[in-house]
């Protein structure tokens, strides 16, 4: 009798838990993009939409999202994160772990490894990832490159950036994505902003901001550091 009761109780609790889990799934868009562009509140303490509504930065990190996932996998991942209540997906265009010459769709990322020659097929894929996220109300916090392309250290590299081509690449990205409704720029990529890196990161950010006045920008430093160490007074840095 006791065993029968226990089994019935377990099945009952399983049904309740399953129902509860289904009810916990968010059914609407992750955010309301119609509230306007994001900005830093005048207090400097939080982010908000241009209509004054506070914005919760609930981010999930998927650095290799653009490089490794195909369209179907991207849709599955973004939908899963929307259901879980995330508002921001953090990812990279030129990522750390995959080769520079091929992506999930079989396209090179750059033609001949030249940062001045972005591969059209790959960046059409980048466009699609941003658009798929926008349709779900998800922001994309986008790194133009991971840090090893500026300062190899423990990464795969190669180091391909100079201040000059970083500015050109940044301006090109700014022109391409300035009207995306769901973008946050992240400069850096687990690297410092000192030494030779300073001029490159500064040029990349300045290039983007020279044409894109619509999106917030921050910096991803290496561990135990803050963007304020190097860029606190930079005109392009909106928040640390």
Provide a role label for each language-model segment.
Residues 1-23:
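Bacterial Sec-dependent N-terminal signal peptides
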Residues 26-239:
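Active-site mouth of glycoside hydrolases
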